[in-house]
From Swiss-Prot:
Catalyzes the condensation of carbamoyl phosphate and aspartate to form carbamoyl aspartate and inorganic phosphate, the committed step in the de novo pyrimidine nucleotide biosynthesis pathway. It comes from Pyrococcus furiosus (strain ATCC 43587 / DSM 3638 / JCM 8422 / Vc1). InterPro entries: Asp/Orn_carbamoyltranf_P-bd (IPR006132), Asp/Orn_carbamoylTrfase (IPR006130), Asp/Orn_carbamoylTrfase_sf (IPR036901), Asp_carbamoyltransf (IPR002082), Asp_carbamoyltransf_Asp/Orn-bd (IPR006131). Belongs to the aspartate/ornithine carbamoyltransferase superfamily. ATCase family. PANTHER family: ASPARTATE CARBAMOYLTRANSFERASE, ORNITHINE CARBAMOYLTRANSFERASE, MITOCHONDRIAL. Heterooligomer of catalytic and regulatory chains. Keywords: Pyrimidine biosynthesis, Transferase. This is Aspartate carbamoyltransferase catalytic subunit.
Length: 308
C-alpha cells in the first residue's frame, strides 16, 4: 500500500503487514536518532495539532516527533483557544487548517470526529483519540514497546486491566492483538467489561479470551499487564463511577504473585491504579512507553508525508 497521503484513523484500517511496516520503520528511526540526534526528513513540512480535549503525552510526543524529523508544528491545545468557541464547525476548522499545514493530528471528544476530519481534508489526518472509540497511535507504540521488551508479540499472555468499557486505548490494542498469537485476559469490574462486539470479534478471529474481575486469580499467568485508569470523564452518571472507583491497585503485594519477567504497562495518566512503589521495580515499563511514542509517531508522520 502507498503510505503517502494516507489517513490514520482506526487500527481496524491496518493490516498486520501495515503494523509491521510502522514498527520496523520506528526501529530504524530510533537507531538513526540515537546516532545523529536530529533528522531532516521532514524539513519544510508543517504538522498541525488540533486538540479539542486535554493531552500531555500524545500532543507533546507528536510535536517532539515532528521536530526530531526536522519539521515544524502549529496548532492549539484546547478548543477554547480556537474559532470553534465562536461556533465554527469541525469541517470548516479542518478545511482552514489544511491551508497552513501538510498533516493534521486531531484529538476530539466525539467518536467519529477524526473520520469526519479525514473525509473533508485533502491532506493526511491522524487520529490522536476520538472519545471512547479509538487511539491507533497509542496502540502502535504499545505494540512497539512489547516487541522491544520481549523480542516478539506472538506467544505472550497479555492482561488488560481496569476500564475496558470506555478505555479507547484497550479497544484499539485488543483489536490489533488479534493479528498475533496471544492469549488475552480481560480483567475489569462487571460494569466496565470490554464491549461485547469486540470480545466476539476477537473470538471469531481465533484469539483465546478470558474474562474475570479477579486480578489475583490470573496475575501469575501474565507476561504483560496493561493497566488503565477508570475514566471519570467518560461516565454518563457519577454514581456509576463511584461504584467502580478504586477497583484495582497494582502494588508490590500484587506483584509478589507475578512472574519475575512480568512487564507492567500503562498509557498514562495514572491516578491510583499503580502505586508509585512499582515505578522502581523491573516490572515497570510505562515511562519507556512514553519514550517509544516518539519513534513510532516519527514513523507514522514520515510515512504519511512520503518523506521516508
Amino acid at each position: 500500500m502507498d503510505w503517502k497521503g494516507r489517513d490514520v484513523i482506526s487500527i481496524r484500517d491496518f493490516s498486520k503487514e501495515d503494523i509491521e511496516i510502522v514498527l520496523s520503520t520506528a526501529e530504524r528511526l530510533e537507531k538513526e536518532l540515537k546516532e545523529k540526534g536530529q533528522l531532516e526528513y521532514a524539513r519544510g513540512k508543517i504538522l498541525a495539532t488540533l486538540f479539542f480535549e486535554p493531552s500531555t503525552r500524545t500532543r507533546l510526543s507528536f510535536e517532539s516527533a515532528m521536530h526530531r524529523l526536522g519539521g515544524a508544528v502549529i496548532g492549539f491545545a484546547e478548543a477554547s483557544t480556537s474559532s470553534v468557541k465562536k461556533g465554527e464547525s469541525l469541517a470548516d476548522t479542518i478545511k482552514t487548517v489544511e491551508q497552513y499545514s501538510d498533516v493534521i493530528v486531531i484529538r476530539h471528544p466525539k467518536e467519529g470526529a477524526a473520520r469526519l476530519a479525514a473525509e473533508v481534508a485533502e491532506i493526511p489526518v491522524i487520529n490522536a483519540g476520538d472519545g471512547s472509540n479509538q487511539h491507533p497511535t497509542q496502540t502502535l507504540l504499545d505494540l512497539y514497546t512489547i516487541r522491544k521488551e520481549f523480542g516478539k508479540i506472538d506467544g505472550l499472555k497479555i492482561g488488560l486491566l481496569g476500564d475496558l468499557k470506555y478505555g479507547r486505548t484497550v479497544h484499539s490494542l485488543a483489536e490489533a492483538l488479534a493479528y498475533y498469537d496471544v492469549e488475552l485476559y480481560l480483567i475489569s469490574p462487571e460494569l466496565l467489561r470490554m464491549p461485547r462486539h469486540i470480545v466476539e470479534e476477537l473470538r471469531e478471529k481465533g484469539v483465546t479470551v478470558y474474562e474475570t474481575s479477579d486480578l489475583m486469580s490470573v496475575i501469575g499467568e501474565l507476561d504483560v499487564l496493561y493497566v488503565t485508569r477508570i475514566q471519570k470523564e467518560r461516565f454518563p452518571d457519577e454514581q456509576e463511577y463511584l461504584k467502580v472507583r478504586g477497583s484495582y491497585q497494582v502494588n508490590l503485594q500484587v506483584l509478589s504473585k507475578a512472574k519475575e519477567t512480568l512487564k507492567v504497562m500503562h498509557p498514562l495518566p495514572r491516578v491510583d491504579e499503580i502505586h508509585p512503589e512499582v515505578d522502581k521495580t523491573k516490572h515497570a515499563i510505562y515511562f519507556k512507553q512514553v519514550f517509544n511514542g516518539i519513534p513510532v509517531r516519527m514513523a507514522l508522520l514520515g510515512l504519511v508525508l512520503g518523506v521516508i
